[in-house]
A protein has these predicted regions:
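Internal intein/HINT superfamily modules and their associated LAGLIDADG
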Residues: 1-178
Length: 178
């Protein structure tokens, strides 16, 4: 897999990309009971083949740790530092599109209560999917594109072109299929 260095022209696109990643195959967990005062944790789940992407994100966010499970190639990039959680929440707030925003709102309530963060809950994003990097993050999390040729191209012949990696480009927000 080729790893490219990414150029971020605005932090805003990073937030859309992170929101897409979390909504695609990530989670925000808020502890309850006696552990409620501990900061929430953000977890991105991925396959070991995607390690360069998450190492790059870890470097960009300057926080977190990566866990590698012994079986199945499953990995998790976890962010649990309170200041880093607040930083990520500020990046992704207002950029969610799915019901996972409920977990984001619980995390905002938690950091507002225990860290005096004073973060407002922004509404769901309704902008066009081609206006930002959200879709790139969502597809990078757990997606692929397929093209099936049938009919006049061959009745029994079909070919699939599957996404190996959607590369996010912050400047143009274009997905490149390889």
């Amino acid at each position: 897999m080729t790893v490219r260095k990414y150029h971020f022209n605005t932090k805003n696109q990073l937030g859309y990309y992170l929101a897409g990643l979390i909504e695609g195959d990530g989670s925000i967990k808020v502890r309850q009971g006696k552990k409620e005062a501990i900061a929430p944790i953000i977890v991105f789940t991925f396959h070991k083949n995607e390690m360069p992407l998450y190492e790059n994100l870890k470097e960009i966010l300057n926080s977190g740790y990566i866990l590698v499970e012994k079986k199945g190639g499953v990995c998790r990039y976890c962010i649990s530092n309170a200041d880093a959680i607040i930083q990520v929440i500020n990046h992704i707030n207002g950029k969610y599109r799915t019901p996972k925003y409920h977990a984001l709102y619980k995390a905002i309530d938690n950091v507002n209560k225990w860290r005096n963060a004073n973060i407002s809950k922004l509404p769901l994003d309704t902008s066009s999917l081609d206006s930002n990097a959200w879709l790139a993050g969502f597809i990078d999390a757990d997606g692929h594109f397929s093209i099936k040729l049938a009919g006049s191209y061959g009745s029994d012949t079909s070919e699939s072109l599957k996404k190996k990696r959607v590369i996010f480009l912050w400047e143009s927000t274009v997905c490149i299929l390889s």
